[in-house]
Amino acid sequence: MSGSFDRYVSFKNSNWEVRSERVMARLQKHIDAAENPFWAYFAQKRIELREKQGLDDLRVLHNYLPTLRELLEDNGDLETLAMLEELEVTLM
């Protein structure tokens, strides 16, 4: 097989990159608050997964979906949770 494979070809016109970036931007406030050790771990893993494995934010979010969902529920961040769940239903 020559060339690169675009696993997101079925996501054409879904705006998945922007939607993933928006969720990550909202998660940044939790990372910055550092109220839970997971957030520092998540921030570091995001960097590692992007740099070493070439994973995009949608894949990083998918990898940590259950934990993110639980923490967002616990923190009462229902707007970010809704955005994350929309990504899950439509793109993951």
UniProtKB/Swiss-Prot annotation:
BP-aspect Gene Ontology terms = nitrogen fixation
Coiled-coil spans in chain: none
Q: Which domain of life is it from?
A: Bacteria
Name of a matching Pfam family? CowN
What is the residue range of the signal peptide feature? none
Per UniProt, the keywords (alphabetical) are: Nitrogen fixation
Disulfide bond annotation, renumbered to this chain: none
Give a yes or no for keyword Glycoprotein in this entry. no
The UniProt entry's sequence similarity note says: Belongs to the CowN family.
Give the protein's function.
Answer: Is required to sustain N(2)-dependent growth in the presence of low levels of carbon monoxide (CO). Probably acts by protecting the N(2) fixation ability of the nitrogenase complex, which is inactivated in the presence of CO.
Query: What NCBIfam families is this protein classified in?
Result: N2Fix_CO_CowN
The protein in question is named: N(2)-fixation sustaining protein CowN
Q: What is the lineage of its organism?
A: Bacteria, Pseudomonadati, Pseudomonadota, Alphaproteobacteria, Hyphomicrobiales
Give me the gene this protein comes from: cowN
